Amino acid sequence: MHLLCFLSLACSLLAAALIPSPREAPATVAAFESGLGFSEAEPDGGEVKAFEGKDLEEQLRSVSSVDELMSVLYPDYWKMYKCQLRKGGWQQPTLNTRTGDSVKFAAAHYNTEILKSIDNEWRKTQCMPREVCIDVGKEFGAATNTFFKPPCVSVYRCGGCCNSEGLQCMNTSTGYLSKTLFEITVPLSQGPKPVTISFANHTSCRCMSKLDVYRQVHSIIRRSLPATLPQCQAANKTCPTNYVWNNYMCRCLAQQDFIFYSNVEDDSTNGFHDVCGPNKELDEDTCQCVCKGGLRPSSCGPHKELDRDSCQCVCKNKLFPNSCGANREFDENTCQCVCKRTCPRNQPLNPGKCACECTENTQKCFLKGKKFHHQTCSCYRRPCANRLKHCDPGLSFSEEVCRCVPSYWKRPHLN
């Protein structure tokens, strides 16, 4: 049942790419021709578009299954389809998120049986180990007067079609099977002799270039090559504007090569296959669109919460600037009302009260032997009315009590 749904959607997507609606036909054809390099623009621009078209053509020629084909043309949309299919069902969207128009698929031009037949044929012809019959005498170059019964044996050898004319289906690992046969030599001097012969049995295959084949045949150290095409050596990188990273080509490709239905003048990145929007990506485990970069509510910090629509951290208290009160302003970074009052030098700011307060008071000044001056918020000492010029030996004049006191009472002057 899943295979039937899979092929049905493949039919719809392929038809959508090839058969535009009448109203959008000129734009679709223009975008398609642009992707293939059929442009009448300036020579430089034409060369760029031709290069981009060659990238897409090379990519399409290299796909080896319906899944890969849809992944190239509609990466996000196809990923969402497979994800929801694993969850038990698929609901095909009916609106184009970019234009608001209903998306029209020409599914009537293909039927499920045809797609199923194509998919089965595609799988049958892929490069893989296949069971074949080989002639024992020809395999080992037996003498003309010697033959074997049975004359042929069944083993697996690599065979199938590669997606490029420059590639060959070759074995990358080989095992050996022992088979017991009758060996007969004429003129018959004795009866058939049972013999055990080892035959090469291919266990994995790969489409390889002639250079790779040469390296494998002439390799000093025989070892199995990877059975699958190598993955990108470099990690996914950030691409320029209007370019997207492609895991098959291992480089950035022009996004317009993948949007056949869009208008020529519209180079927006919100394509039809961008099902999650500009700030989100598909989580294949949950089949949900989540914020890019792993942004979660816990990463927003105190006083903030994650807006799941815009994927931005916003203030959770929803305060407005006029709700902070006098001498306070709303700080969007901390999501709090902060004091912005400017105080005189002798009246520092008290952040908790957002008020200018004196650092000195009557009690503090009294302990210093001074009086508190309210206007200046400072302590001061009144001059002595009768200041003695000379004190008896062992005594010193104190400005605090305006009399002579023992010298050891006098506090040292502190710089």
Curated annotation (Swiss-Prot):
Expressed in adult heart, brain, spleen, lung, liver, skeletal muscle, kidney, testis and intestine with higher levels in heart, brain and kidney. Isoform 4 levels are very low. Isoform 3 is mostly expressed in liver and has reduced expression level in other tissues. Isoform 2 is mostly expressed in brain and kidney, although a lower level expression in other tissues is also detectable. Undergoes a complex proteolytic maturation which generates a variety of processed secreted forms with increased activity toward VEGFR-3, but only the fully processed form could activate VEGFR-2. VEGF-C first form an antiparallel homodimer linked by disulfide bonds. Before secretion, a cleavage occurs between Arg-223 and Ser-224 producing a heterotetramer. The next extracellular step of the processing removes the N-terminal propeptide. Finally the mature VEGF-C is composed mostly of two VEGF homology domains (VHDs) bound by non-covalent interactions. Glycans are attached at residues 171, 201, 236. Its main location: secreted. Residues 32-107, 224-415 form a propeptide. It is found in: Secreted. It comes from the Eukaryota. SUPFAM superfamilies: Cystine-knot cytokines. Sequence repeats lie at residues 276-291, 300-315, 324-339, 343-358. Disulfide bonds join 127-169, 158-205, 162-207. Keywords: Angiogenesis, Cleavage on pair of basic residues, Developmental protein, Differentiation, Disulfide bond, Glycoprotein, Growth factor, Mitogen, Repeat, Secreted, Signal. GO terms for biological process: angiogenesis; animal organ morphogenesis; cell population proliferation; cellular response to leukemia inhibitory factor; epithelial cell proliferation; glial cell proliferation; induction of positive chemotaxis; morphogenesis of embryonic epithelium. Pfam families: CXCXC (PF03128), PDGF (PF00341). Residues 1-31 form the signal peptide. GO terms for cellular component: extracellular space; membrane. Residues 276-358 are annotated as: 4 X 16 AA repeats of C-X(10)-C-X-C-X(1,3)-C. GO terms for molecular function: chemoattractant activity; growth factor activity; vascular endothelial growth factor receptor 3 binding. Homodimer; non-covalent and antiparallel. Interacts with FLT4/VEGFR3; the interaction is required for FLT4/VEGFR3 homodimarization and activation. Growth factor active in angiogenesis, and endothelial cell growth, stimulating their proliferation and migration and also has effects on the permeability of blood vessels. May function in angiogenesis of the venous and lymphatic vascular systems during embryogenesis, and also in the maintenance of differentiated lymphatic endothelium in adults. Binds and activates KDR/VEGFR2 and FLT4/VEGFR3 receptors. Belongs to the PDGF/VEGF growth factor family. This is Vascular endothelial growth factor C. The gene is Vegfc.
